Curated annotation (Swiss-Prot):
RNA chaperone that binds small regulatory RNA (sRNAs) and mRNAs to facilitate mRNA translational regulation in response to envelope stress, environmental stress and changes in metabolite concentrations. Also binds with high specificity to tRNAs. The gene is hfq. It comes from Acidobacterium capsulatum (strain ATCC 51196 / DSM 11244 / BCRC 80197 / JCM 7670 / NBRC 15755 / NCIMB 13165 / 161). One of its GO terms (molecular function) is RNA binding. Residues 72-106 are annotated as: Disordered. One of its GO terms (biological process) is regulation of RNA stability. This is RNA-binding protein Hfq. Belongs to the Hfq family.
């Protein structure tokens, strides 16, 4: 069994584009468009480099991050079936279905 802690999709995406030095476009909530490569990131900010210039961008100001190529080929979200979580059943387990107006208590 894999004992590594699950990494959230945001960290997985940002870390992949950082390691691969993939050019990205960041759109801020104000509508400003920034381009460059991620040098680093933490819980609250992203360090973007473009033309040897660094910009520290606070995550609360970011609306969208767009990569110039496909980054996440599989579903890397924590808690998704196939990644350490049990499969999600589209129907309730037997004996748990109730009809409208029916009480489930004893």
């Amino acid at each position: 069994m894999d004992n590594k802690p699950a990494q959230n999709i945001q960290d997985t995406f940002l870390n992949t584009v950082r390691k691969d030095k993939t050019p990205i476009t960041i759109y801020l909530v104000s509508g400003v468009k920034l381009t460059g490569k991620i040098r680093s990131f933490d819980k609250y900010s992203v360090l973007l480099e473009n033309n040897s210039q660094e910009q520290l961008i606070f995550k609360h100001a970011i609306s969208t991050v767009v990569s110039s190529r496909s980054v996440l080929h599989g579903d890397h979200r924590p808690g998704v079936a196939g990644h350490g979580a049990p499969p999600i059943s589209p129907t309730p387990p037997a004996g748990t279905h109730s009809t409208p107006g029916e009480s489930s208590g004893a």
